[in-house]
């Protein structure tokens, strides 16, 4: 007689699905309530009450203008974005709104006031800064000034602290660190902006490859074999390129004519470094060298960078005044 084997019940397996990142929603009107500081009272701002003072910048996303509120005299930067260009642009806009809304307690990120909808555009209202790093360093070199090491250290410290806040508190990677997205004001503050292409991190990795400005991209985002995923160390590379650019007055890579030239120069050739004769300290040169490690596994993340001697010097530097230097350059340029 053939015995039938008993069916063995497998132990129950609990499948844990990752918590999906919520997609920010947009429910805007043609007016919004804003607070200039955490302590100030809310003021209602209507789009029709804003007067354009000057254009601050423009790009594929839209335009940034300096505006003034008629009734209160409040001046702000307003980023006007077409809300219905395409799905990708709308996603970028929602990313920016989401990041801005959650960044209020970070002094190294441009302060978000509010957002409103006006004639097919989304208006993102932010604090106005006095200049961007790309305009600033070019102005400085144009009038015969160079960018001193203490400035570079304090700028890098602010940027890393802002990026670290994005990672730890917002679970975001910026993905477009470059001089035009680093803003300065006459008080000596340095803040990062433009979170439109920032990406959510899954297990500390970002998966979208097309976001960002190619001249500042690290090897792992260009090389076809490795660009499927990357982490915050991609922004560390971009910061290293930014530091060299403002330190020597020009981007460390020549202009690329073809994608192959970019692949060859960034992926295949040694990384750029500060010239030995530039007069920068050993700690500064080592910091930049570590930011530009070709193998991202060897490249430090934010906590390690913040613990380096160059950052410690920037923290403790008391003689150099960011505000004084920024005002000196801006005043000289505007007098010409």
UniProtKB/Swiss-Prot annotation:
The keyword Lipid biosynthesis does not apply. Coiled coil: none annotated. It holds the Pfam family Pkinase. ATP binds at residues 56-64, 79. SMART domains: S_TKc. Belongs to the protein kinase superfamily. STE Ser/Thr protein kinase family. MAP kinase kinase subfamily. Its cofactor is Mg(2+). This is Dual specificity mitogen-activated protein kinase kinase sek-1. Disruption phenotype: Upon infection by P.aeruginosa and E.faecalis, RNAi-mediated knockdown results in a reduced up-regulation of gst-4 and gcs-1 expression. Causes a severe reduction in rnt-1 accumulation in the intestine during oxidative stress mediated by paraquat. RNAi-mediated knockdown in a ced-1 mutant background causes a moderate reduction in germline cell apoptosis during oogenesis in response to oxidative and heat shock stresses. The phenotype is more severe and also affects the response to osmotic stress in a mek-1 and ced-1 mutant background. Its EC number is 2.7.12.2. Residues 50-311 form the Protein kinase domain.
């Amino acid at each position: 007689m053939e015995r039938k084997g008993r069916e063995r019940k497998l132990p129950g397996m609990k499948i844990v699905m990752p918590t999906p990142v919520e997609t920010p929603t947009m429910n805007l009107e043609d007016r919004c309530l804003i607070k200039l500081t955490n302590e100030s009272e809310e003021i209602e701002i209507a789009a029709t009450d804003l007067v354009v003072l000057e254009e601050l910048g423009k790009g594929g996303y839209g335009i940034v203008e300096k505006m003034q509120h008629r009734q209160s005299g409040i001046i702000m930067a307003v980023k006007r974005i077409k809300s219905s260009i395409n799905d990708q642009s709308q996603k970028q806009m929602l990313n920016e709104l989401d990041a801005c809304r959650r960044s209020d307690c970070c002094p190294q990120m441009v302060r978000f006031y509010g957002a409103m909808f006006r004639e097919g555009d989304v208006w993102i209202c932010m604090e106005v800064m006095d200049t961007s790093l790309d305009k600033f360093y070019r102005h400085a070199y144009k009038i015969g000034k160079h960018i001193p090491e203490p400035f570079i250290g304090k700028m890098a410290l602010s940027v890393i602290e802002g990026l670290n806040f994005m990672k730890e508190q917002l679970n975001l990677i910026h993905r477009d660190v470059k001089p035009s997205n680093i803003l300065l004001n006459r008080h000596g503050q340095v803040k990062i902006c433009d979170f439109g292409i920032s990406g959510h991190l899954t297990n500390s990795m970002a998966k979208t490859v097309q976001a960002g400005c190619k001249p500042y991209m690290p090897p792992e985002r260009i090389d076809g074999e490795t660009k499927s995923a990357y982490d915050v160390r991609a922004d560390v590379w971009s910061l290293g390129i930014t530091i060299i650019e403002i330190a020597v007055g020009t981007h460390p890579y020549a202009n690329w004519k073809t994608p192959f030239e970019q692949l060859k120069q960034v992926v295949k050739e040694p990384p750029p470094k500060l010239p030995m004769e530039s007069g920068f300290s050993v700690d500064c040169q080592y910091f930049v060298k570590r930011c530009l490690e070709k193998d991202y596994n060897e490249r430090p993340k934010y906590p390690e960078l913040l613990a380096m001697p160059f950052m410690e010097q920037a923290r403790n530097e008391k003689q150099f005044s960011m505000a004084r230097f920024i005002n000196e350059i801006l005043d000289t340029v505007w007098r010409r």
